[in-house]
């Protein structure tokens, strides 16, 4: 493959065409069943209809989705709900014709609404989702699913019984770059996967401006254990899903540590965590996140016997780099001290320094939290599914396990012990089927 990113970057539509996902294709359905194409009849139905959406939770992530919905021709936002007036006012400016509510239950009573999208704080996800499904609505809920494993399981069970569509906001499942990366991994490009290292580093305090002290916990809910699980649910769940996706199996146990290392400002959730997930085949996924240094950013480093994949950077690297021709190879070997030095009285060795090869680009583009990370593709797929009434196979299962694994990681940190995946929270999927 030519090492030129501009030559391989594809438009999202061209990318999905390449994978056979548009126009009745199904090349990757066995590996990525949530990407199944619409039938010809489905496409006719989608072209003729609009799904009427009630949107619950109009803060920053909510408004991001609301802006994206404007670009989807078969999405019609007819109602908005938030119990924080400034956010509701901002959302109303985007959709001035939409009804407004300060109580989500009143929105659910509106029979004109076919589907709801939920972008509230984490502690509200479970009960709003369950109430919406009971009200006969299709549901899109932001990740993570819930604050407890029991609530995640309740959401899953109600969804399965409802006959409705449910999507969870795991956008990497629709990110063309990640899809292409997984196609390459599952085809054996990297050889046998033997380790995964994932991390997400930021440098900010997670605080939002508070107009009044009595609103501190409402606005800065991410910092308090009553409302938030911190880094494991806000960040880690994205990357845990990627690890499971790459290995096509689920870890059996987890150990971890966490502390408030830097932001000693009265917060209750950790600002630094380290986790180790152990898979049945012996592979470990290590995860680290902190919010006091952003130098390394975020990545999932998927390491195999033949190479390494970095899907967030859009690169993969082979272990054995093709040698440079002639004199350039000799110069490189001398400069990098490839030849062993034999000392007079001591061992002969060469340090295992990191590889300096530039790697090869993966097709597609991504930018976390912005257009191009799979978010708009995910919401588009939800709108299509809400019109046809056909759920995306295995999407909720992927989201369920990433949510529960994050919560088990937090339990391992809090209790200071290795946590084995509890049987009562296993649902039939992958190696837990």
Each language-model region and where it sits:
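N-terminal secretory signal peptides
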Residues: 1-11
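N-terminal Rossmann-like dinucleotide-binding module
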Residues: 22-95, 175, 243
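Predominantly a Rossmann-like dinucleotide-binding segment in NAD(P)-dependent oxidoreductases
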Residues: 57, 61, 161-168, 172-267, ...
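Stable alpha-helical structural segments in soluble proteins, enriched in small hydrophobic residues
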Residues: 88, 370, 374-378, 405-416
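Conserved SAM-binding strand-loop segment of SAM-dependent methyltransferases
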Residues: 99-103
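N-terminal Rossmann-like NAD(P) cofactor-binding module of classical short-chain dehydrogenase/reductase
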Residues: 116-117
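Beta-strand-loop-alpha-helix segment that lines the small-molecule cofactor/substrate pocket
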Residues: 121-122, 126-174, 188
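C-terminal glycine/acidic-rich active-site capping loop/insertion
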Residues: 210-220, 231, 244-246, 253, ...
